[in-house]
Amino acid sequence: MIWHVQNENFILDSTRIFMKAFHLLFFDGSLIFPECILIFGLILLLMIDSTSDQKDIPWLYFISSTSLVMSITALLFRWREEPMISFSGNFQTNNFNEIFQFLILLCSTLCIPLSVEYIECTEMAITEFLLFVLTATIGGMFLCGANDLITIFVAPECFSLCSYLLSGYTKKDVRSNEATMKYLLMGGASSSILVHGFSWLYGSSGGEIELQEIVNGLINTQMYNSPGISIALIFITVGIGFKLSPAPSHQWTPDVYEGSPTPVVAFLSVTSKVAASASATRIFDIPFYFSSNEWHLLLEILAILSMILGNLIAITQTSMKRMLAYSSIGQIGYVIIGIIVGDSNDGYASMITYMLFYISMNLGTFACIVLFGLRTGTENIRDYAGLYTKDPFLALSLALCLLSLGGLPPLAGFFGKLYLFWCGWQAGLYFLVLIGLLTSVVSIYYYLKIIKLLMTGRNQEITPHVRNYRRSPLRSNNSIELSMIVCVIASTIPGISMNPIIAIAQDTLF
């Protein structure tokens, strides 16, 4: 009799577990269908690499790009659906999260053709490179939809581990090894700081890990204004700051930009900021709802330091990649203005709009740098002197992207900054907006210095790198040029027709 009862209990427990697994797979699993497409693409890459020879290399690029495009398509089909929480509260799907996932997928889709010729010329391992890019993309997408502290920690670790491996991909290069070591050590330290902040938040809320439940727990325990929350806020801000790389958490950025392969830098420069921005908006806006004044002050300090230090130090740089590293530090200061403004006054909409333009401007600039580096073997700014005389198309493309980064009208960067600063002004962030305007003028100065060098380099200034430059054909099947053309067009034309982009961004608000 006892055995019969135990057997019935075992059958009931097994059935319950099976039904729960079935529900997770077929119901909750449908909410992560775009991520599942990328996972399937990863499996296909491994299968083809293990069963084929070097002749099937184009298939690897095709599968990677196709899986990313299919994931974007699946994401667009899910647009405007009702917000849903799945996997026992670990993951949330809504328009706000999905627009950031779309931006990450867009970055990866543009970065793969940008990397093709570079990988072939440097004889890097192709399969592993594509695997790391897709895995980092999956980690970034899960981070955008993360709804609890555990997922918010695990997802960026997935992204970070792939980032460390990508930054050290050219292992024979001493600079790459140095960059990887700094990136790894500082990344590990920032992760431990972030977890420590989560532990304070977990304890203060009475043991809650879901973001909304943390708010309810803080209300129930009357701890929403306690010193523990302030400590948690400081540690979490420092941890997230490493991913965003604002000053003073920027020390790793110039070395990693200079030492890593240029396509990797292009990938990391946009995807890490998009994923970290998505995470920061949710963490600051939900668990720290009652501490808005405190985190506003912290982010204002970070934004001011980033805009001033990033743009001032960029003036002194002689390497194009280091200059863009400090420029990106200044750019994230502008993005932080949108995070501070928040849901009110279209702060998030302006941040998303500027992020979209920043992706096209930054990737377009890096595409030009990759192309120039492959044809000349140099990354020094002075070696760009007189490039217009050898390759007008490349010189004009680089000039347009740099001018758009600086925010000159009528390019997309100008309208993105204008919308962002207008929202900040409407929210009363007058000092931040003034600092942003002044530092934008500074950035225009060092961008124009490079453009002047491109266009008017005198014969005595032209280095052997440009004298021996191989002129590109007018019609080229080069995948880097394809990415460059797409990014240059996206950096110029969308600024003229801003209303549809702003309307889509406004639809993503909570």
Curated annotation (Swiss-Prot):
Disulfide bonds: none annotated. It is found in: Plastid, Chloroplast thylakoid membrane. Its EC number is 7.1.1.-. The chain crosses the membrane at residues 24-44, 57-77, 99-119, 124-144, 149-169, 183-203, 227-247, 295-315, 323-343, 354-374, 395-415, 418-438, 484-504. It catalyses: a plastoquinone + NADH + (n+1) H(+)(in) = a plastoquinol + NAD(+) + n H(+)(out); a plastoquinone + NADPH + (n+1) H(+)(in) = a plastoquinol + NADP(+) + n H(+)(out). NDH is composed of at least 16 different subunits, 5 of which are encoded in the nucleus. HAMAP family: NDH1_NuoN_1. Belongs to the complex I subunit 2 family. NCBIfam families: NDH_I_N (TIGR01770), PRK02504.1 (NF002701). This is NAD(P)H-quinone oxidoreductase subunit 2 A, chloroplastic. It comes from Guizotia abyssinica. The gene is ndhB1.
